[in-house]
Amino acid sequence: MSKELSPKYNPAEVEEGRYQTWLDQDVFKPSGDTEAKPYSIVIPPPNVTGKLHLGHAWDTTLQDIIIRQKRMQGFDTLWLPGMDHAGIATQAKVEERLREQGISRYDLGREKFLDKVWEWKDEYAATIKSQWGKMGLSVDYSRERFTLDEGLSKAVRKVFVDLYNKGWIYRGEFIINWDPAARTALSDIEVIHKDVEGAFYHMNYMLEDGSRALEVATTRPETMFGDVAVAVNPEDPRYKDLIGQNVILPIINKPIPIIADEHADPEFGTGVVKITPAHDPNDFAVGQRHNLPQVNVMNDDGTMNELADEFNGMDRFEARKAVVAKLESLGNLVKIEKMTHSVGHSERTGVVVEPRLSTQWFVKMDQLAKNAIANQDTEDKVEFYPPRFNDTFMSWMENVHDWVISRQLWWGHQIPAWYNVNGEMYVGEDAPEGDGWTQDEDVLDTWFSSALWPFSTMGWPDTEAADFKRYFPTSTLVTGYDIIFFWVSRMIFQSLEFTGRQPFSNVLIHGLIRDEEGRKMSKSLGNGIDPMDVIEKYGADALRWFLSNGSAPGQDVRFSYEKMDASWNFINKIWNISRYILMNNEGLTLDQARENVEKVVNSQVGNVTDRWILHNLNETVGKVTESFDKFEFGVAGHILYNFIWEEFANWYVELTKEVLYSDNEDEKVVTRSVLLYTLDQILRLLHPIMPFVTEEIFGQYAEGSIVLASYPQVNATFENQTAHKGVESLKDLIRSVRNSRAEVNVAPSKPITILVKTSDSELESFFKDNSNYIKRFTNPETLEISSAITAPELAMTSIITGAEIFLPLADLLNVEEELARLEKELAKWQKELNMVGKKLSNERFVANAKPEVVQKEKDKQTDYQTKYDATIARIEEMKKLNND
């Protein structure tokens, strides 16, 4: 047991050193109990590109909540940590650092550059692990993995070779998405489409005989040097007689043919389309059909090459301006038509993606997708939470394209293909024997290795590996909806292909962390928040409580410091309740408390309030467990908050003072037992969410770590509807009296007469038997409970289930004075309503103010109207009393 709780809750003191203690005690490792059911999670590996953000904190908090609860429930739990090499992202970061020193990766060469990247990886991996510790993540570091570990690399090579041998990986020249900044290919889902201002540039291509011109339009005139034809629809009567003739490509005066192809739409524009097979996917397909040459006019960095004539070496966008100016000077520019269109941008570097002809490696997706789709109709299907994301997954799998997996980078899994001087290619898990072989310089898409994460981390391809046999398939994956396509889908089809099983049973999808205004957090907006800064101010438990309590599967969460204040206040409340209970504990042990509680539920000792709180505790255990099973942590948090603050702290703890401040030692022991037992159960329920503070308090009265303590279970013997119904009626009575006092502005300290009329004999007896509680909470001068009470002429009346409550007002209230006070209050609310109404009737304000500002004013209006109406009602009531 640890030292006594400090008078004030200080998260820094509570959390300092605790994580290292857990690590020293090995409490995060699997139990090794072969009789226990296994439950495993693999952490979505963060990129070693920098520090973790608030989204990572949310993602890992949810996983930790799940694994801590399952550990307490007796499962043999494994939460496997690890990190992703993040090829393009990490390489870009290291290259940026080198540029600041005036060095490029080419200056260093591949081997020395990779040494620099490994240094970066070690630096940021240490930072990430430190942040995991601050968050309190109960991962098993003895099983930590990295996507470039040799074991995982072996798995990657095997998967590549097996798919290649099946004909499902192939190499070919196709139009791909090219990132000129990173100088690498991108898959379709690594391209973010944004609406940008652009233009259609209309230009004339003159027939070779000079008889007429054909007007074509393009958004990328700089690619015209790669034009190898113009196409018209074979059924378009305007151009039928021109098919087979040539037009002259402006600026370079090169003749290119007019071809017939249905790609040209007679209804769109002039019906004439320029064909640039090396720079447009549709044109590439046309070129394939007509056996056209493929002319690439750009370098891999987005500059124009020597085929662009005088524009050689210019950046593509500068070349665009220069080409348009040249066309205008030559008389070939017809018009510029401004418009907004969707343009692809690199997810990693943010630059405009260039469609580019390139030789790349691809995964053929047809059969892999069919397997994944078919699996969702079996007992082995992956369950999505919420279920609507199954539709998202299925839609993507049904419409998936072949996956370009090669990247023109140095950091990553180098493609296991080798070439010799004779033009031969060898694909294998190991290098070919003999000299003269050169390995493909490209690396694999990061997501290729990440797709194997759930089983490669468990020892696969060794299917006899202990962890693979014990913990695969994994139980639950927690991740954001933004990477269902990138990662979740790929893990599913790769796992089905190579293990014959789904990679995980459940996928919990969460949303994004947004700021108070609902905006996505980003560097450009400057609204990003470092979770470590939040932890420094509020503690990890408060952040974890906010992240869990504010979340519903699939929904976004808005971060606010107001919510963080509320989270801290809740933990502070728990701390203060705990201090009160432990200070009055008088050496009572948890085992003694359990024995006494058993007697309470059997009605051998204790009072009705003891049985009421134990009944409600039991209901809370059931509801929280059910919510956890559905991954509805926000619902669980609401249930816990209400029970702890409202029922336990505000009611039961206050009710116990009646006993604890008495001279009855036997009753005191029972009350202390119920208090300690209930606190213990609360801490166990809270531990998965608030590990640090619950461990600190648990250590005051129990041995060992709460990490390995058993999780509460529903106990049928605790159910007591009679006690529940009785105390709820008692609470209703007390609340009613308090509300009536407040309505007529009578101070709680002023003694009053309370008359309770009920025809329910059981309720009458219950109220009389527990009148001490009524008196403690309502401060009556006189309390009368009877079925024979007659309502006084001047009284506040309220009705609860089974009873009427009268508060005689004759000696308490000057009706005239109260009416005058209420009239002033009414005028105040009318003034507020006039002010907000004037603002909302201002069309300029409504049109120009931020939506959230307008909504705030509308909320004020609703609040003021409610208060205005309530005041009117009170005035009418006072007038009625006055007339009576």
Swiss-Prot record:
The keyword Manganese does not apply. Keywords: Aminoacyl-tRNA synthetase, ATP-binding, Coiled coil, Cytoplasm, Ligase, Nucleotide-binding, Protein biosynthesis. It is found in: Cytoplasm. InterPro entries: aa-tRNA-synth_I_CS, aa-tRNA-synth_Ia, Anticodon_Ia_Val, M/V/L/I-tRNA-synth_anticd-bd, Rossmann-like_a/b/a_fold, tRNA-bd_arm, tRNAsynth_Ia_anticodon-bd, Val-tRNA_synth_C_sf. One of its GO terms (biological process) is valyl-tRNA aminoacylation. Residues 809-844 form a coiled coil. ATP binds at residue 523. It comes from the Bacteria. GO terms for molecular function: aminoacyl-tRNA deacylase activity; ATP binding; valine-tRNA ligase activity. PROSITE patterns: AA_TRNA_LIGASE_I (PS00178). A motif ('KMSKS' region) lies at residues 520-524. GO terms for cellular component: cytosol. Its main location: cytoplasm. ValRS has two distinct active sites: one for aminoacylation and one for editing. The misactivated threonine is translocated from the active site to the editing site. The C-terminal coiled-coil domain is crucial for aminoacylation activity. NCBIfam families: PRK05729.1, valS. This is Valine--tRNA ligase. It comes from Streptococcus agalactiae serotype III (strain NEM316). The gene is valS.
